[in-house]
Design a protein with these regions (language model features):
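Catalytic/RNA-binding core of pseudouridine synthases
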Residues: 1-243
């Protein structure tokens, strides 16, 4: 296998750890790569942000491959999501404490499977208030944290597949294949609403982005070994061509 030239450009798939921000993962890879290559800077970007409480596939592009970010982000994404029915939180996940509680005794496995069918295809989804969506030039999460009132417009998305993997009330686990821009936190909210019971995300793992699967990803603790085995050290020519 020909070694990768990170300076000229390469695409790498990493498994983002729990609690790490997408920026932290990019910064970690950049620092490790610069140290290995003996350079001071390296252009690195990522395709598709993951919340700190989510794990899984994160695609990084270096050098000229940063120009492929939009193309990579447009790929279909697959997630495994755990949803807690019967309660809601302001952020639609476990970042905040529950703010409302609802009964779940009426929810059968058949009811969940029927509700999930209603989300397949083209749907309209209102993003979470605690999100990076911009409202009059400001991030929605900044306004939400300050207690400001505002409305977010629904976005048109596509859910290609949605499957119930586990049913153990009040928890359910689903697999989702969807288009760019889908908020699985918002999907958890909407599934809870469809079942006449609130819902919020308790765990989220992205298992695919386009053709990149979780099995193809390197863990953070394996970055140094990956660099040594698969990345070419720079020559004088490549050092001077750093984008």
């Amino acid at each position: 296998m020909e070694k990768l030239d990170l300076i000229a450009g390469a695409t790498i798939a990493l498994d983002k750890p729990l609690t790490w921000s997408s920026f932290s993962l990019v910064n970690k890879f950049r620092c490790e790569a610069c140290r290995y290559l003996g350079i001071k800077k390296l252009k690195v970007g990522h395709a598709g942000t993951l919340d700190p409480l989510a794990t899984g596939v994160m695609i990084l592009g270096t050098g000229k491959h940063t120009k492929r970010i939009d193309e990579l982000q447009a790929g279909r994404k697959e997630y495994i999501a755990d949803i807690r029915l019967g309660q809601t939180t302001p952020t639609f996940d476990m970042e905040t404490e529950p703010d409302a509680f609802f009964p779940t005794e009426h929810i059968t496995r058949e009811a969940v499977e029927e509700a999930l069918k209603g989300f397949i295809g083209t749907i309209e989804q209102v993003p979470p208030a605690f999100s990076a969506v911009k409202v009059d030039g400001r991030r929605a999460y900044d306004l939400a944290r300050k207690g400001r009132d505002f409305e977010l417009k629904a976005k048109t998305l596509v859910i290609d597949e949605i499957e119930l993997l586990d049913y153990a009330l009040p928890q359910i686990q689903i697999r989702v294949v969807c288009s760019k821009g889908t908020y699985i936190r918002a999907l958890a909210r909407d599934i809870g609403t469809a079942l006449s019971s609130g819902g919020h995300l308790t765990d989220l793992r992205r298992t695919r982005v386009g053709d990149y699967r979780i099995e193809d990803c390197y863990r953070v603790e394996d970055i140094q070994a990956f660099l040594r085995e698969y990345v070419a050290l720079p020559t004088e020519d490549t050092e001077h061509s750093n984008p």
